[in-house]
Design a protein with these regions (language model features):
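Catalytic phosphate/metal-binding cores of nucleic-acid and nucleotide-processing enzymes, i.e., regions
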Residues: 1-148
């Protein structure tokens, strides 16, 4: 099983991570490896200069985040794509939640290592809502991963 680390700047010390630097590389790598062959994905939120500008100009001083100011796709976009990709591979079926809990569910563990608290919260909230709707444990959290 593979592990994917999305970050435009940092590189994890643990060499088991496959590092991707942007949304495009992320989508390509997940499709190449296959969602069922990935055990863990850690997402940064701010990918690129305009995302970092938004972080320093609005998030840090004002605790607000305006996605209209960000030109690049973010880790949040990657989280949304993951859920959409999962449903493309596993079309939703109308079954009772008890049966859903017992059925096989293959989705990697998702974490975020973003320094941006609002972006990290958006990622964890989105993934945990998806897991809740699939009758699964809501285990997406913000983590620290040692990096160079």
């Amino acid at each position: 099983m593979k592990k994917i680390y999305l970050d435009d700047v940092r590189t994890p010390l643990d060499t088991e991570w496959i590092v991707v630097r942007n949304y495009s590389e992320f989508v390509t790598k997940v499709q190449d490896i296959g969602l069922n062959n990935i055990s863990e994905i850690s997402l940064d939120h701010d990918l690129g200069d305009t995302a970092m500008d938004e972080y320093f100009n609005n998030v840090q001083p004002n605790y607000t985040l305006n996605y209209d100011n960000i030109q690049e796709k973010t880790g949040y976009d990657c989280a949304k794509w993951l859920v959409e990709h999962y449903y493309q591979l596993n079309p939703p079926v109308d079954v009772p939640r008890l049966i859903m809990k017992k059925s096989e569910f293959k989705f990697p563990k998702i974490t975020t290592h973003s320094a941006n608290p609002i972006g990290a919260s958006n990622i964890t909230g989105y993934i945990n809502n998806f897991l809740f709707n699939e009758a699964r444990e809501q285990n997406c959290v913000r983590v620290k991963i040692a990096h160079v």
